[in-house]
């Protein structure tokens, strides 16, 4: 799967904002910015547009990013727990070692997005549209991945314990490196999913089959 990375200027050419230095203005659009160590919980940033930006070690818990747009953006070691990103758009975005516990991404659009080393337990991606999205080394325990509309989705070494996959088309998706203990799923949802022999036996038990 080809993933286009975020296209961002060198940091020396970005406009820097920080918690202890220059604070970002109250604007609707931000382009070519580095947000370093900002602490802005519960901030109202709905419908804002961010292009060519880096968020580094920012505390963005409970922030309202409803209908916000992110193009060519990197989130690096940020805390987005309980952030509301419903119907937001993410295009060429990387989440690196971030926390997205209980983040709301209902009906969001994710295109060319990577999540690497993220803690995203209870994240809600219900009815999200995913196009070339890769989850690597992520904790997705009890995540809601219901009714996903996905094209080219990959999971590598992720923990999906008790995650909900109802009405999520998993055909052709390789889950052999992932933990699938107690996932919530229907038989049609499993059709075409690639699993290991051990995983196949565990999934059979979830569906009420007796394996001898």
Language-model regions: role of each:
Residues 2-212:
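Tandem repeat scaffolds
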């Amino acid at each position: 799967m080809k993933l286009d990375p975020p296209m961002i200027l060198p940091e020396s050419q970005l406009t820097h904002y920080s918690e202890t230095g220059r604070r970002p203005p109250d604007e609707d659009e931000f382009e070519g910015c580095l947000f370093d160590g900002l602490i802005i919980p519960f901030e109202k940033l709905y419908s804002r547009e961010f292009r060519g930006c880096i968020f580094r070690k920012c505390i963005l818990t409970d922030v309202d990013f409803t209908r916000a747009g992110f193009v060519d953006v990197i989130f690096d070691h940020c805390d987005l727990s309980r952030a509301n990103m419903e119907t937001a758009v993410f295009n060429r975005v990387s989440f690196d070692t971030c926390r997205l516990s209980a983040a709301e991404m209902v009906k969001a659009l994710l295109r060319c997005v990577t999540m690497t080393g993220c803690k995203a337990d209870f994240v809600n991606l219900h009815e999200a549209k995913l196009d070339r999205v890769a989850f690597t080394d992520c904790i997705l325990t009890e995540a809601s991945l219901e009714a996903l509309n996905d094209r080219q989705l990959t999971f590598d070494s992720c923990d999906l314990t008790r995650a909900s996959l109802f009405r999520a088309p998993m055909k052709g998706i390789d889950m052999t490196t992932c933990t699938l203990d107690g996932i919530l799923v229907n038989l049609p949802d499993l059709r075409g999913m690639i699993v290991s022999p051990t995983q196949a036996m565990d999934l059979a038990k979830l569906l009420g089959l007796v394996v001898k």
